[in-house]
Amino acid sequence: ELIQGSPALALSVIREANRQARSGMSEPAENLEVAITRLGLKRTEELLARLPTLPQLEIPPALRQLQLISQHASQQANGFFASRLARLWQDIHWGSLLFLSPLWPMALTSPQLLEEWERRVIHKGESARKVELQLFGVRLLEICQALVDLWRLPIWVEQGYRLLLNEQRELVKVLRI
């Protein structure tokens, strides 16, 4: 229950299970249940004990905001799709919860970069591509895609970033419908 309520803990457990699985080239753990099964309760407990904790007020607002958005996305996805696609509930839940997780480390270590991006792109209307190249040296979506691949996050997350990076015209067509 503790892990279910904390996106960062869930991400840590899934990443660790996928890191361990990479050497055996098995399929990535797509959800928390599979990750805990692979790690075992003892290793999961040891992992959680090693993770640093911060009081709520010391967590950068950018990270809190991204994690709240992630939790909200998961709740919305569950509300929209879980009853109709019950067999995919886990995929829907973890895919939507972890979609923004590649941004969490940056929000923790360099929140000012994301705040600057938000100020310039969202509020001032500057080109996202131009701002991202100035701030990060590469597109933000490319950073996210690289972390998704490295962490072996669920396929829905991977496909989402591929769509955003490579199929923008198709995405615009779909959204117009």
Regions found by a protein language model. Give the residues of each.
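Post-HEXXH active-site segment of zinc metalloproteases
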Residues: 111-123
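Conserved alpha-helical "signature site"
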Residues: 1-114, 128-152, 157-177
